[in-house]
Amino acid sequence: MKVCDPRDGDPLATLAKWYTTPLGRQVARAENACLERLLGDTFGHYLVQFGASGQFEDAARACRMRHRLVLGETLNECRPGMPTAGRSFSLACIRSQPDRLPLASASVDAVILPHTLDFCVQAHEVLREVERVLIPEGRVILFCFNPLSTWGLMRWMPRRSRQAPWCGGQLTPFRVGDWLRLLGLQQETREMLVFRPPLQRAYLSQLDWLETAGMRYWPMFGGVFAVRAVKRVQALTPLRPSWTQRARILPGRAVEPTARKNGHASSG
């Protein structure tokens, strides 16, 4: 993993500022639309998100869950709850480390990780914590920058290599998929987003055609990938009890009734 410049503070907080730039707003729109799709058929009571709350307000409004909890290493990301269509959801913010969630086991219906894995040292431990707090059939939705793209190449630029979002880890979709599988989290869907290169504002409007072309011709090279996985719990198969006893063969090849052996034969 590349090391982010410590003078910039928390890389996730720096990422939140980057989302306000022209390029960051392009990414935020694509990720917000994707999250809204992935949350469309996700139900439950408790939704947990680690950081970047401001970038996903539209998706949160459309979410069917009533309680939303935002976690983060700082409390700057927490915003007041906003009404959803005909209802309102509660919003709470708690300071926490991503690999030590202050939540009970099997207590959360869905978890959102917006680039959390990109900027944590122990990404696998974060997923392990997510698996712990999810209920059976609960879902995790995560976003990561794709190193197998022009965005990944930009991370090797000397001027950008220690600044968010370029200083994060090099997690490929395949590695993340392997980790999920090892933890019993079954990958349901994966989407590739943002096929235009990370160029300045003057060129962004001229590259809209790359989004359609990228989805069709080089889908694995999107600058961002999103994954939704579900926690599968295998049910134990009970052993079938042996209620009947094997009949004993008597002389003359007659079969002894089991009822007589159990004392239930009628007297005669």
Regions picked out by a protein language model, each given a short descriptive name:
Residues 124-139:
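A short glycine-rich, Lys/Arg-flanked "PGG" loop and its adjoining helix->strand segment in the class I
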